[in-house]
Amino acid sequence: MPLFGMKSSTSQKDLQKSNTSDLSLQGKASSELALDGWHTIALEYSVDWPLQLFFTPDVLSKYRKVFQYLIRLKRTQMELEKSWTAVMHQDHVDFSDYCKDRKNSSATQLRRLRTKPFWRVREHMAFLIRNLQFYIQVDVIESQWNVLQTHVQDSHDFTELVTFHQDYLSALISQSFLDIGSVSRILDSIMKLCLQFCWSIEQYETGANMFEIDHITEEFNKKSNSLYTILRSSRLAGSQRAPFLRQFLMRLNFNSFFETTARGVMNSGRLRPGTASTQL
């Protein structure tokens, strides 16, 4: 019987959320920081004979690659949602305190005013991650799975079946841009920046530097603009490697926000925290 499993060389106890403080000291892109052990989580699949002829090491490696990408994408989405829930709860508490004692609640009001721009940035991040996740799971995986099922039903021998399955995996890799170094590095940086933003917000009340959050915001907007610029390039948009790329770009740029910022109209691609929400 084939066995499924997950393994990680780093436990969750080893999470190092304090790495966000390095931003103000090093000024490096977040893609250079190893935030925690989530990137080491891998899918393991033990195959018995004769399925080893079908699930070769190369096939399992491709499944692992897609799995790691999906789990990191989902984890980023969950962190963004969790941060919103936590701060909305605190905001309701602050508002309640303000209503009870308006004369002595200036500090509470000041905190609410300071944190509002952060959640505009968070919504910008969540917007990109949600659309990317939808594209990968629906436009890529689900559509290619339907194609594979059709081909399997029409296959006549084992060789054809192997070929169709290889085509399926290759399509997942290519249409998810995992085989394009420039795109995969940007996606990796975007997810790390989202996590750093969430963790910085959690530490805000305990002394997180405003410069850190501003730096993360600036880097995120640079990376997201770069991603949009690359994906809409003629090399990708005009090819057949990503047939649903146009729909993905349309969802991202439904109000011309990405197109405007990618052209450098807004101060060389830098967005202020209050800008994203008005556009999104």
Located regions from the model:
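Extended, charged interaction scaffolds in large complex subunits
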Residues: 1-280
